[in-house]
Amino acid sequence: MQVDLEPLNGKSILVLCSGAGGIPFWLAERTTQGHILGVELDDDLLGAARLSAEEKGLSHLVEFRKAEKTRLAFPDNMFDRLISEFIIFPTPTPTEIGQPEMARVLKPGGKMVITDVIVTKPISPEVRKELNAIGLDYLCEGTAGDFRSWMQEAGLTDIEVKDFTPLVKAVWERRRNQDASPVHRTGYSLLLEDASLKLGEGTFYIYVRGTKPAT
């Protein structure tokens, strides 16, 4: 991610669904100037992030604000970088903000990075509940091709969509082997064995990047 966002120093960076601040703090460790703004819907996570910023002595670099569900309350062309990350630091309260709205607040030449967990077909509330039980709190219905199309429709260029499901699958397999709870068996079975839903067949971890044209 860092390579696709460089340079970071002195940049204005927006982090969507910033949770307890994992990504903003990660960015702050890699820059000495600029402004990193995280927006989050969950009040408890927002409060925790603000407290952590003070404790870490990063309030001069990092700010956290309450998010809105369907829009970004910022002017056009405001940020140099935008990150929407749902894999390493997922939030239980995602927004419903699409790529066009994200692109709107990016400056010309600005860079966008999105990570997501996707299912390629609709799943029932019962299946979603079983996956939630093992820690898969958020799933986006769509395909890698959909994400590419959405980025293109938002006017972004230099688009790349990467599938890194095989790397994450090994992590889930280790978790299953270490988890003795019988209530989690169905969730692991769905994610790792179900013919239509399992990782690499119906569920994927993707990384998406794009750039807003400079002119």
Predicted regions and their residues:
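Short, glycine-/aromatic-enriched active-site segment of Class I SAM-dependent methyltransferases
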Residues: 117-138
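A short acidic, Gly/Pro-enriched loop at the edge of an enzyme's catalytic core
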Residues: 70-82
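A short glycine-rich, Lys/Arg-flanked "PGG" loop and its adjoining helix->strand segment in the class I
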Residues: 96-111
